[in-house]
């Protein structure tokens, strides 16, 4: 839906038609960049400063499908930037999806009635049977904060071994 244009609002008033694809393209690029950074094999890094076994790390990296072995064994086992990068990309993507979901909810509302959802995507209200709730969009909005929390959690874990990473 690269050419999907929606009516955008400022102060709850319609003002311009624009696309959402640019922010989602950036999100895709963030995930692609993250995958590229993960294309290094940590095998042989051991618990701290490498292994005493005579292994050819370049050979094993290639055999396992990695571009190359990691450059630094301490960095391989103690840094969490790979997880931070992924969680950051997830949080930004969630923010954009939340923004899009919010706009869909508003544009679907009785006040605007500019878009409509398929009935399969709606649920009825427990007290108002005529009311239809766009639950998927609401769930996207509601889950965004969880992504922020996970990013914040990993940012505050100290270097090297810390068992709270399992939470």
Where are the regions that the model predicts?
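Single conserved hydrophobic/aromatic residue that forms the stacking wall/gate
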Residues: 1-12, 16
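Short, solvent-exposed helix-loop connector elements
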Residues: 163-167
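Internal glycine-rich alpha/beta core junctions
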Residues: 17-160
């Amino acid at each position: 839906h690269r050419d999907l244009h929606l009516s955008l609002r400022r102060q709850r008033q319609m003002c311009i038609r624009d696309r959402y694809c640019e922010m989602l393209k950036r999100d895709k690029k963030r995930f692609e960049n993250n995958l590229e950074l993960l294309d290094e094999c940590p095998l042989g890094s051991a618990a701290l400063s490498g292994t005493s076994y005579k292994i050819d790390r370049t050979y094993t990296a290639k055999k396992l499908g990695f571009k190359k072995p990691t450059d630094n064994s301490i960095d391989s086992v103690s840094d969490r930037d790979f997880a931070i990068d992924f969680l950051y990309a997830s949080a930004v993507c969630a923010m954009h999806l939340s923004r899009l979901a919010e706009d869909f909810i508003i544009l679907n509302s009785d006040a605007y009635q500019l878009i409509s959802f398929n009935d399969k995507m709606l649920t009825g209200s427990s007290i108002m049977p005529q009311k239809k709730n766009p639950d998927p969009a609401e769930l996207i909005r509601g889950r965004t904060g969880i992504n922020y929390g996970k990013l914040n959690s990993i940012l505050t874990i100290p270097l090297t071994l810390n068992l709270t990473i399992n939470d």
